[in-house]
Amino acid sequence: MAVVDISEELKSLSSTMGSIEAVLDLDALRADIAALEEQAAAPSLWDDPEAAQKITSKLSHLQAEVRKAETLRGRIDDLEVLFELAADEGDADAQAEAEAELESVRKALDEMEVRTLLSGEYDAREALVTIRAEAGGVDAADFAEKLQRMYLRWAEQHNYKTEVYETAYAEEAGIKSTTFAVQVPYAYGTLSVEQGTHRLVRISPFDNQGRRQTSFAGVEVLPVVEQTDHIEIDESELRVDVYRSSGPGGQGVNTTDSAVRLTHLPTGIVVSCQNERSQIQNKASAMNVLQAKLLERRRQEEQAKMNALKGDGGNSWGNQMRSYVLHPYQMVKDLRTEFEMGNPEAVFNGEIDGFVEAGIRWRKQSEK
């Protein structure tokens, strides 16, 4: 790469980083960190474990964000020195090393730029993810379980905390549905682009004749409700059912009636939780899910009114958005962004950052 090209490239990278720093408002983030550190140092912090967990989690996330931005700025500043040294020494290996670092910085900058696109009203929230097996019988149930594993592995790779609230196992294999939380800031803004119907095409391992089977699973992503949302639920409007938790094949995993199912009578919304140790904990988790669903219902009603005013029919969350083809060829393709990967196994193992980043950019472009 010519010296002039390198100089212009480095100026462009520095300018892009400057724009990202302005959007992130690092000074404001540092002030937030200082305030949270003060709260975290309070002797009474763990008097309320749930509040303490939120404070420490948010503090850790903000510290990581600032550290990531500062590190990337340092790498960009160091690039000029790397290329100058390579040129002065006339060393091909040093030049190759500098160019590899340049490519790595480009990629890191692209990833950080995506974070600045998460500016929606609820984007900074934690996320509640629900996956349901749809058409396709046992293959759909197996597919739903693959998607659950995919998202949990993705979260694990990013060191994001997750909590599975409920999993309804299918009789033969897989799951009927599952609900879990991704407990990190901006989880909702990030994962909401995964909402929709996912399609799997493969030779069914459950078909004795080895025929190709198409199956579907639905992914719903909701923001976790906070006190400022004012989602109040009257206990008189709830029907509470308790039952024993069950595992794969209907096998009981608890000897007491600790699982809880809540039915919101005015709307007919039903949620359940069985993964906590006690009935009280399961009810609290189920209430969190119910609040999120009621918030989403309110948002959809408000959006419907806006769409009616604009003459826009809107998009249903059930629209097909991604295909996972394992036969006759191997390809995972997002039908909205055209982003694709030829390694479905890697995708099912949690390597979905490319799809998520492309989805966030596509959504931002669609809003213009």
UniProtKB/Swiss-Prot annotation:
Main location: cytoplasm
Compartment list: Cytoplasm
Gene Ontology molecular-function annotations: translation release factor activity, codon specific
InterPro entries named among the record's database cross-references: PCRF, Pep_chain_release_fac_I, Pep_chain_release_fac_I_sf, PrfB
PROSITE patterns assigned: RF_PROK_I
Free-text description of this protein's post-translational modifications in UniProt: Methylated by PrmC. Methylation increases the termination efficiency of RF2.
Domain of life: Bacteria
GO cellular component: cytoplasm
Keywords of the record: Cytoplasm, Methylation, Protein biosynthesis
Entry-annotated residues carrying N5-methylglutamine: Q251
Similarity comment: family membership: Belongs to the prokaryotic/mitochondrial release factor family.
General function of this protein: Peptide chain release factor 2 directs the termination of translation in response to the peptide chain termination codons UGA and UAA.
Name of the protein: Peptide chain release factor 2
